[in-house]
């Protein structure tokens, strides 16, 4: 129970911002968010594209053109997947650089939170002991009443209600006092910890967006290398796409010529 109280108390002091540190999650970098959004977008476009292609190919014009767009889409999807796979090492390189630059800040923040846990532990132990004592006293006071429940009449129910009400109200008030006392004991740590947490998280966010000159230089260098390595990959993708575009253009031209001959 004490471990649960410690965790809840720290989350109460710091807010949900500290969640990733207690769960030992790596903070999501801007690159992570961009990649996740890109993956979702590509999957959505792919699913929507298949539906549209299926409807088009089943139409009269689609059957006449016989473009086999579904097959071409699968080929293009494979090419796009290959491009994304080839980009993965470069993405990891930039991500690892960001994590390395923010490692010290994240370690400092974890240390601050651990120090606060140790400082508030005595208050939580005291709160837990008092709470347990109050509940036990309440249980003992109710034991005779529970015995009377075995033989109830309407009159006895009303009498028992009169007995229980003041006891329940007294216990409720005492437990509220314990919670209020705990809140007052933790209050001095709340402002300091929130300020430290906000400061550290702000520094991490700033590291995630290349603003410092040193970090800017690193990112520019990495992006320059990435652009050089990606150029042939993008060119290969464009070359894969060109035949399908030319095929579509030629078939449309043939269809227009056929329509003109029919109308002549």
Curated annotation (Swiss-Prot):
Single GO BP term: positive regulation of substrate adhesion-dependent cell spreading
Record GO cellular component, one term: low-density lipoprotein particle
Pfam families, alphabetized: Apolipoprotein
Superkingdom field: Eukaryota
Subcellular location as annotated: Secreted
Tissue expression profile of the protein: Major protein of VLDL, HDL, LDL and in chylomicrons. Expressed in a number of tissues including liver, small intestine, lung, kidney, heart and muscle with highest expression in liver and small intestine.
InterPro entries on file: ApoA_E, Apolipoprotein_A1/A4/E
Keyword flag Transmembrane helix: no
Extent of the signal sequence: 1-18
The Sequence repeat ranges on this chain: 67-88, 89-110, 111-121, 122-143, 144-165, 166-187, 188-209, 210-231, 232-242, 243-264
Primary location class: secreted
Region of interest: 10 X approximate tandem repeats: 67-264
Keyword terms: Cholesterol metabolism, HDL, Lipid metabolism, Lipid transport, Repeat, Secreted, Signal, Steroid metabolism, Sterol metabolism, Transport
MF term (GO), any: amyloid-beta binding
Chain's role: Participates in the reverse transport of cholesterol from tissues to the liver for excretion by promoting cholesterol efflux from tissues and by acting as a cofactor for the lecithin cholesterol acyltransferase (LCAT).
PANTHER family linked to this entry: APOLIPOPROTEIN, APOLIPOPROTEIN A-I
Family according to the record: Belongs to the apolipoprotein A1/A4/E family.
Protein name, entry field: Apolipoprotein A-I
UniProt organism field: Coturnix japonica
Gene giving rise to this polypeptide: APOA1
């Amino acid at each position: 129970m004490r471990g649960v109280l410690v965790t809840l108390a720290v989350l109460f002091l710091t807010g949900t911002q500290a969640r990733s540190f207690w769960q030992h999650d790596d903070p999501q970098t801007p690159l992570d968010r961009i990649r996740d959004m890109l993956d979702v977008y590509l999957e959505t476009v792919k699913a929507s594209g298949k539906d549209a292609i299926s409807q088009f190919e089943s139409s009269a014009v689609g059957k006449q053109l016989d473009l086999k767009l579904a097959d071409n889409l699968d080929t293009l999807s494979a090419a796009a997947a290959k491009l994304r796979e080839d980009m993965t090492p470069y993405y990891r390189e930039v991500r690892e650089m960001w994590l390395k630059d923010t490692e010290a800040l994240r370690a400092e923040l974890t240390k601050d939170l651990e120090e606060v846990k140790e400082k508030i532990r005595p208050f939580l132990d005291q709160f837990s002991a008092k709470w347990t004592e109050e509940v036990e006293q309440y249980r003992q006071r109710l034991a005779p009443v529970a015995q009377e429940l075995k033989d109830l009449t309407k009159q006895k129910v009303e009498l028992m209600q009169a007995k229980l009400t003041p006891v329940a109200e007294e216990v409720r008030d005492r437990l509220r006092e314990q919670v209020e006392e705990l809140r007052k004991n933790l209050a001095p740590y709340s402002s300091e910890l929130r300020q430290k947490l906000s400061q550290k998280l702000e520094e991490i966010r700033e590291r995630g967006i290349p603003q410092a000159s040193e970090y800017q230089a690193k990112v520019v260098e990495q992006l320059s290398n990435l652009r050089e390595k990606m150029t042939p990959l993008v060119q290969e993708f464009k070359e894969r796409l060109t035949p399908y575009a030319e095929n579509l253009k030629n078939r449309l031209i043939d269809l227009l010529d056929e329509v003109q001959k029919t109308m002549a």
